[in-house]
């Protein structure tokens, strides 16, 4: 193993060559489920596709992503490993928040979109099967995951799901920001600052009309969303989004619901992450690759469901295309 990015980036360049082309997704928008399975079997996901059902597609996507992304920290040591680990920890936060929502709504584990992070699928399944969020924290504590401590602390403050998610993000990003400052990786720091902005926008939408104090949920460390804008958006002042013209978030002007916001944020973060290909000697190339793989997983699951349930193209097209 190497302690810099030269070796890792060489491996990542090869793996980027297995990313699915845009033509795959355009073709898949019109396919039956059987034809979608055939097309998927001819890709890098085919080796893990062991059945003919929707759960088999999800399993193939999850396991392929784990192989092609989850092992990246193990390919390097030192600062390079820590930088990659911070990227994948962000996915662990996503996974924990997704499992908390699934538990609260009775959604089965198989329907949860897990992103490749630092933990195996089996650990997330055990967390899902825990009796309550406190039990989930206990499961995460076994491998010594930092989110276990964060979840325990948050649960001492509130049991409300929206507040739990927001406070988890606050603790997570505060810890990650501290760790990132110690690394000589400007591409990582700049990207994480955008993630903080995105999380603040997301949280403000979720907590609109709650009457809660903004200071308890506002994340420091962003570039474009300050505390004043955060508080205004929590109060329903959508002019905040118009004020972001000239920033990476300019495309959010006019957004009024959480679903549209999530879709817009996903595309903004993907676009900014892909600029990392211009950072061949640092973590930027890995950042671009990780986010491209994530987007690929999201699109595959959505297209599989469109084909399986026979949904019209127009119903999912805007969900699987980033301008």
Curated annotation (Swiss-Prot):
Biological process according to GO: proton motive force-driven plasma membrane ATP synthesis
Pfam families named among the record's database cross-references: vATP-synt_AC39
Gene3D superfamilies registered for this protein in UniProt: ATP synthase (C/AC39) subunit, domain 3 (1.10.132.50), V-type ATP synthase subunit C domain (1.20.1690.10)
Superkingdom classification of source: Bacteria
SUPFAM superfamilies reported for this sequence: V-type ATP synthase subunit C (SSF103486)
Keyword line: ATP synthesis, Hydrogen ion transport, Ion transport, Transport
GO molecular function annotations of the record: ATP binding; proton-transporting ATP synthase activity, rotational mechanism; proton-transporting ATPase activity, rotational mechanism
One GO cellular component term: proton-transporting V-type ATPase, V0 domain
InterPro entries (UniProt xref): ATPase_csu/dsu_sf, ATPase_V0-cplx_csu, ATPase_V0-cplx_csu/dsu, V-ATPase_V0D/AC39_subunit, V-type_ATPase_csu/dsu, V-type_ATPase_csu/dsu_dom_3
Role, per record: Produces ATP from ADP in the presence of a proton gradient across the membrane.
Protein family membership: Belongs to the V-ATPase V0D/AC39 subunit family.
Protein name: V-type ATP synthase subunit C
